[in-house]
UniProtKB/Swiss-Prot annotation:
Disulfide bonds: none
Gene (name only): gatA
Function: Allows the formation of correctly charged Gln-tRNA(Gln) through the transamidation of misacylated Glu-tRNA(Gln) in organisms which lack glutaminyl-tRNA synthetase. The reaction takes place in the presence of glutamine and ATP through an activated gamma-phospho-Glu-tRNA(Gln).
Protein name listed in UniProt: Glutamyl-tRNA(Gln) amidotransferase subunit A
Pfam families per the UniProt record, alphabetical: Amidase (PF01425)
């Protein structure tokens, strides 16, 4: 049920938050053995939060804009008193003493947390295969990956285990799993949503955003979590517009740029066909399609895989077995304990990225790799700026392919990294971007359309995505799937 309809039902007495939360927990119990979307199901907290909503309504108090809405929280967001593992052995037993800004705002808005969702370890991956607690399955085909790193959040929404979910996006970790799982995934402008309480991967790239089954629901969640936070020095101190009010504004005359460099060799033919059909759908709604070129777009992935591991190597230096996190036993000295704790606590992919980042930042190579990557990042941002002088939005596929099978890329890191080829540039430039379902391939797997907007233009992004969603009605003729709600 969309958030707007649910809110009406809750307030007119035809439904209760308690009933709604129990339905979500029952759905989780029925599907979780096969789906494995959650690291931790928080049934007691869900019931307590739902009861508080019902009591507020009974007392004629405002329960909040997301009252009773069930939500899954990616397990790299700190939740006070509830384990936050980052799907890593390193933080398997870590219980944060404080609440992240986004979850704090969600609880004040009346949302109900049903659990912490699975992810690639420390958000490093594109499939959830690097999770220390096992891979999440794709609800459309349990024999395929859900994408990553926010695979658990995408899967739980697609499977109807909760209404919405939160993820984090460093190089596509919201949009790519949204594409693979056939849901809406929104990455806001860098700084639009506070990162306070998000376990850091790459601090200049990380951003938090929602998953939902409709664009309107993503707008409703963004409305709550967006806004300045003095605890985050990168948080933007600018007003938050009414995102829901923007959804139905007319889109006639808007210019949509078809980014030529996104339609590359290796793009699955069905993906290209669906995305080009979506562009024509927007043209039929009154948008003007314009071919746009950003020649350095394809340099994004090489740039990212210098900058992100470099920042990760610095951020993950704090896990030394002393202050918190996993501590290895039977070490002969402090230095041996630190080395052993990190070797045993971090998985292979995390260690690989730490090594890459440490190398890129080393004295002999920092100019050749890290500083050069930052220069290319600036050039990519400038190309986007020039593109947005011509058009209002840019359009690409979200991912080059539909969901792949476990193991298909896990032994080939470069092939796995290419899954984020089309999403990474928006992170490098700090742009808002959204993935919306636009079709299915011959195997019944979802395909995602990506739209990108200038900085702080989430209103326009949501507006166009909503009009496309309403006109295309992709899910009306969806194929049957074993775990999809």
């Amino acid at each position: 049920m969309p958030i707007g309809a649910w809110s009406d039902a809750l307030r007119n007495g035809s439904a209760t938050a308690k009933e709604h939360s129990e339905q979500a927990l029952e759905r989780i119990a029925a599907t979780e053995p096969e789906l494995k979307a959650f690291v931790n199901v928080t049934g007691d907290q869900a019931r307590a939060q739902a009861e508080a909503v019902d009591q507020a309504i009974a007392a004629k108090q405002d329960p909040g804009p997301l009252a009773g809405v069930t939500i899954g929280i990616k397990d790299n967001l700190c939740t006070k008193g509830v384990t936050t593992t980052c799907s890593s052995r390193m933080l398997e037993n870590f219980v944060p003493p404080y609440e992240s800004t986004v979850t704090e705002r969600l609880w004040k808005a009346g949302a109900v947390m049903v659990g912490k969702t699975n992810l690639d370890e420390f958000a490093m991956g594109s499939s959830t295969e690097t999770s220390a607690f096992g891979m999440t399955s794709n609800p459309w085909d349990p024999g395929r990956v859900p994408g990553g790193s926010s695979g658990g959040s995408a899967a739980c929404v697609a499977a109807g285990q909760c209404d919405v979910a939160l993820g984090s996006d460093t190089g596509g970790s919201i949009r790519q799993p949204a594409s693979f799982c056939g849901v809406v995934g929104l990455k806001p402008t860098y700084g639009r949503v506070s990162r306070w309480g998000l376990v850091a991967f790459a601090s200049s790239l990380d951003q938090i955003g929602p998953f939902s089954r409709t664009v309107a629901d993503s707008a409703a969640v963004l409305q709550v979590i967006a806004g300045h936070d003095p605890r985050d020095s990168t948080s933007l101190d600018v007003p938050v517009p009414d995102y829901s009010a923007a959804l139905n504004r007319p889109i006639q005359g808007l210019k949509i740029g078809i980014l030529q460099e996104a339609f590359v060799e290796g793009l699955q033919p069905e993906v290209e066909a669906s995305v080009r059909a979506a562009a024509e759908q927007l043209a039929s709604l009154g948008c003007e399609l314009v071919d746009v070129s950003c020649p350095r777009f394809q340099a994004g992935i090489a740039t990212y895989y210098v900058i992100a591991p470099s920042e990760a190597s610095a951020n993950l230096a704090r896990y030394d077995g002393v202050k918190y996190g996993y501590r290895a036993a039977d070490a002969e000295s402090l230095s041996a304990m630190t080395a052993k704790s990190r070797a045993e606590g971090f998985g292979d992919e995390v260690q690989r990225r730490i090594l890459i980042g440490t190398y890129a930042l080393s004295a002999g190579y920092v100019d050749a790799y890290y500083k050069k990557a930052q220069q290319v990042r600036t050039l990519i941002r400038q190309e986007f700026d020039r593109a947005f002088e011509q058009v209002d939005l840019l359009l690409t596929p979200t991912a080059p392919t539909t969901a792949f099978t476990p193991g298909e890329h896990s032994n080939d890191p470069l092939a796995m990294y290419l899954a984020d080829l089309l999403t990474i540039p928006a992170n490098l430039a700090g742009l808002p971007a959204i993935s919306v379902p636009c079709g299915f391939d011959g195997q019944g797997l979802p395909i995602g359309l990506q739209l990108m907007a200038p900085v702080l233009q989430e209103e326009r992004l949501l507006q166009v995505a909503h009009h496309y969603e309403q006109a295309a009605d992709v899910m009306a003729n969806r194929p049957e799937a074993p775990l999809v709600a």
